[in-house]
Amino acid sequence: MPTFATPAPITAAVQVAGAQVRVTASDRTDTVVLVEPINEASASDLKVASKTEVDFAGGQLTVKTTVSGDKRGSVAIAIDLPADSRLVANLAYSSVHADGPLGACELHMASGQVQLDHIDALQANIAAGEVAIGHIARRANIDGGGFVMRIGEAKGTVGLSSSGGQAWIGHAFADLDLSSGSGNFDIDRADASITATTASGAIRIGRLTHGQAKLMSGSGDIEVGISEDTAASIDVNSERGAVHDSVSSQGNSEPSDHRVMVHARTRHGDIIIQRAAS
């Protein structure tokens, strides 16, 4: 079990194929790595584990599978490291599960699953796979193919570009710039401006409290909820669909310090503008 003295946060670079990786970040002054075959009775799993390289130099931990594992997973890798360490992961049919606070993270995924707890920032290129992140403190830049992205809280701006898939954000505190060829966007709450464009997909904002929403879908429904205490300027149109705008029909009877603007267009689909559920 390799152990390295690390009194400060480090960079953990993981390059794996057919691996299950677990990262635990906590208040500690060393880094410990454990590499084990998932099936000790499997000669191929034993080979992948024995050929996995672990090295530490210049503040960077490197873990690399030199022999590709099975797509079901051949090697289990556990990394315990200092809180706020950076994670750089290159993954092929692998999974990463991280607990505890990490610094800036960089993901390059051919396929796989990633679950991160609390990170500082994100740079990601995802060909395929699923990513779930509890909290991002600063900027996130995400691009790739058809993937599923879930973010509980985004404190910084988010830029996302994909060919397809789905993106869900629980609470966006800063601006969002989202685009997809055939993806769906689902935002529970947005406290800043949103630009969302998809050629074929649905766009939903559960609650918009501030800023401007510019929403465009070639084929798909659009739904926006607006807070009760927020005045709204609405400009929406569907070429081949129904428009239900209960906010404009109610008017803004009382002065409000909060105002949002909604500009929405879809060619094939319905548009719903309504007051957000309390």
Features from the language model and the residues they span:
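Intrinsically disordered, low-complexity terminal regions
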Residues: 1-278
